[in-house]
A protein has these predicted regions:
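N-terminal glycine-/charge-rich "phosphate-binding" loop or analogous flexible N-terminal tail
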Residues: 1-51, 170-174
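Short, well-ordered coil/turn residues at beta-beta hairpins
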Residues: 8, 50, 73, 205-208
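Short loop/helix-cap segments at secondary-structure boundaries that form the rim of catalytic
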Residues: 15-22, 38-41, 62, 80-87, ...
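Short acidic/histidine-rich motifs immediately flanking catalytic phosphotransfer sites
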Residues: 40-46, 64-68, 198-202
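Phosphate/diphosphate ligand-binding glycine-rich loop within oxidoreductases
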Residues: 46-127
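Rossmann-like adenosine-cofactor binding region
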Residues: 54-57, 174, 178-222
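Glycine-rich NAD(P)-binding loop of Rossmann-like domains
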Residues: 99, 126-161
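Aromatic pocket-lining residues of Rossmann-like dinucleotide-binding sites
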Residues: 166
């Protein structure tokens, strides 16, 4: 019996995957929509999720008796309810397992830095102003980043890239991360309370888990 693989994600990824599989399994590109995914998983052997648009709940997994593996094109897997998968012994693979590959993948860090710049220079409000015909630049002075203090919560791969970007802009970089042993170059370790009290810009780069849920909460902003 030919194994059946369900793929969720962009057409380009499906095409590339089809070339790799080369007919050794039946590969199906399924719309990232809950009902379609649940129906497709019924007799699937594997789920390759490159969309992360659908929450894969216990019910979907329980209704897929032939499912043997789930693989995600992300470093996190909080879009999957692990309960039934763990009960069945179904492994969930993510990109976190391939550190060498991840080391030079920078889009998440680049987008994060773009958001820092957009917030510091008040770009959304300024853009809306100009689209309405305005050109009152003094209304949007923004924040000069040079000489300011950047605080990173989570100092792993993405945090390390953020530190480089901050240093390139002339910022002092401090970080909080109780889970790492080796700190990226240029980050000064500090406590979470101290980070909030001293930093002009704060950027969060941690996976959502039971340990990290609520890590950044209202009292820190008071």
């Amino acid at each position: 019996m030919t194994s059946r693989i369900v793929y969720l994600g962009a057409p380009e990824g499906f095409t590339a995957l089809a070339e790799v599989i080369a007919g050794r399994a039946k590969l199906e590109h399924v719309e990232a929509e809950p009902t379609a995914v649940a129906e497709a998983l019924f007799d699937a052997s594997a789920l390759l999720d490159a969309s992360m648009k659908v929450y894969i709940d216990d019910g979907m997994i329980a209704a897929a008796p032939d499912l043997k593996v789930i693989s995600c094109a992300t470093t996190g897997s909080d879009h999957i309810d692990r309960g039934e998968a763990e009960r069945r012994g179904i492994p969930i693979h993510t990109l976190r397992e391939d550190r060498e590959l991840l080391q030079n993948i920078t889009p998440a860090a680049e987008l994060s830095w773009a958001l820092v710049l957009a917030a510091a220079r008040r770009l959304p409000a300024a853009l809306a102003h100009t689209r309405e015909g305005g050109w009152t630049r003094e209304n949007f002075p923004g924040l000069m980043l040079h000489g300011k203090r950047l605080g990173l919560i989570g100092c792993g791969r993405i945090g390390g890239w953020m530190a480089r970007y901050g240093q390139a802009f002339g910022m002092t970089v401090v970080g909080y991360d109780p889970f790492i042993d080796t700190w990226p170059e240029g980050i000064q370790p500090t406590g979470l309370k101290e980070l909030f009290e001293s930093c002009d810009v704060i950027s969060v780069h941690v996976h959502l888990s039971d340990e990290t849920s609520g890590l950044v909460s209202a009292p820190f902003f008071s």
